[in-house]
């Protein structure tokens, strides 16, 4: 691990085998009986933009994780049962989820019958006993999360496609890598080093380009031959679109919802704003990135080419609800400036062996 990089966290382990059925049913009944004003109709999964979040992404569970690690499963479950009426504190994905719900509110005002909205799913390997406290916390914060997947110790990744997941956020890097391998857009989310106030009315999402929106083709050139060869390669292939990266589909989903506001003449008032924040240089390699987005029928509201400069200070000005990058040092730099950053474990940069293999294979070209 490089100095200053965030530690990779893992989800708490499974609970005990015996489910607290009465507690679960009581909490679920309360949730189902919420007034219709607070509880709009849930969309069909195949029509919605589905965001799956883990329990430790949505809420802070540091003490619970410590108990599980140091004292084991039984003590962990006992602690959760004793504190199930105490809501968890918000975690790193909490402001992002609140912003998604703010967008949904605007969409329902404009399109009352449309199911083309965000649908948030709580995806966790916790046991149903812990689920009671999760439901109580969701009710406490007036979150609209109706779909739960609690797998009692098994990995929930196999269920992501069944939930039509467009994006999966977790504090467990192993599960995120598993999701990426399954072709699901996913990222490991980290808490910032300090709290920063973010917009309550506009969802702001910032993306790195290479190995996030785009494939890692260009990074392979850099690893194998250096920057000079990379600039030559990008110039020669300026009009050839890059292959898609793991989060291209999520940007596409955001763009689809943005167009619903544009069609109502609300482009300037759109509650979704997207940013491309890349280390590429505009003059030498920026055109290919923009032309690739254009070839997909996509765009970002802002495109920021930093030519290798640190991303943290710029992100501090943008104040996105989440920033996606494949490089851990960019994630750490964003954290230091108060940005909720998420690591996308994709591409040649994730594995030194892959980088060496890329250098060997590209050396023959």
Curated annotation (Swiss-Prot):
UniProt keyword terms in alphabetical order: Cytoplasm, Hydrolase, Magnesium, Nucleotide metabolism, Nucleotide-binding
Residue stretches of biased makeup (Basic and acidic residues): 1-11
Organism of this sequence: Mus musculus
Pfam families, per database record: 5-nucleotidase
Cofactor(s) the protein requires to work: Mg(2+)
The name this protein goes by in its record: Cytosolic 5'-nucleotidase 1A
Function: Catalyzes the hydrolysis of ribonucleotide and deoxyribonucleotide monophosphates, releasing inorganic phosphate and the corresponding nucleoside. AMP is the major substrate but can also hydrolyze dCMP and IMP.
EC class (word): hydrolase
Similarity remark: Belongs to the 5'-nucleotidase type 3 family.
Active site (record annotation): 208 (nucleophile)
Region (Disordered): 1-23
Superkingdom, natural source: Eukaryota
Activity regulation, free text: Activated by ADP.
UniProt keyword annotation of Nucleotide-binding present: yes
Entry EC no(s): 3.1.3.5, 3.1.3.89, 3.1.3.99
Catalytic function, reaction form: a ribonucleoside 5'-phosphate + H2O = a ribonucleoside + phosphate; a 2'-deoxyribonucleoside 5'-phosphate + H2O = a 2'-deoxyribonucleoside + phosphate; IMP + H2O = inosine + phosphate; AMP + H2O = adenosine + phosphate
């Amino acid at each position: 691990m490089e100095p200053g990089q965030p530690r990779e966290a893992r989800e708490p382990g499974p609970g005990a085998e015996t489910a607290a059925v009465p507690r679960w049913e009581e909490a679920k009944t309360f949730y189902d009986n919420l007034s219709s004003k607070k509880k709009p109709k849930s969309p069909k999964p195949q029509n919605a933009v589905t965001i799956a979040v883990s329990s430790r992404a949505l809420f802070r569970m540091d003490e619970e994780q410590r108990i599980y690690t140091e004292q084991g499963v039984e003590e962990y479950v006992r602690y959760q049962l004793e504190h199930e009426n105490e809501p968890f504190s918000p975690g790193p994905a909490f402001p992002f989820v609140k912003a998604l719900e703010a967008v949904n509110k605007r969409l329902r005002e404009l399109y009352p019958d449309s199911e083309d909205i965000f649908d948030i799913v709580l995806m966790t390997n916790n046991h149903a006993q812990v689920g009671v406290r999760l439901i109580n916390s969701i009710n406490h914060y007036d979150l609209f999360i109706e779909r739960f997947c609690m797998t009692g110790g098994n990995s929930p990744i196999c269920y992501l496609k069944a939930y039509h997941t467009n994006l999966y956020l977790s504090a467990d890097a192993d599960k995120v890598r598993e999701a990426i391998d399954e072709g699901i857009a996913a990222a490991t989310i980290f808490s910032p080093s300090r709290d920063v106030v973010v917009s309550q009315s506009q969802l702001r999402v910032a993306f790195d380009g290479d190995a996030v929106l785009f494939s890692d083709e260009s990074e392979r050139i850099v690893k194998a031959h250096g920057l000079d060869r990379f600039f030559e390669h990008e110039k020669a292939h300026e009009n050839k679109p890059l292959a898609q990266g793991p989060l291209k589909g999520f940007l596409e989903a955001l763009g689809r919802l943005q167009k619903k506001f544009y069609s109502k003449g609300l482009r300037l008032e759109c509650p979704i704003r997207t940013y491309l924040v890349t280390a590429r240089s505009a003059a030498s390699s920026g055109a290919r990135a923009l032309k690739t987005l254009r070839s997909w029928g996509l765009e970002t509201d802002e495109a920021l080419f930093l030519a290798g400069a640190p991303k943290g200070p710029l992100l501090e000005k943008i104040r996105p609800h989440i920033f996606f990058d494949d490089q851990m040092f960019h994630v750490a730099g964003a954290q230091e400036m108060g940005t909720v950053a998420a690591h996308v474990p994709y591409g040649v940069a994730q594995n030194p062996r892959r980088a060496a293999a890329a250098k060997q294979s590209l050396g023959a070209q």
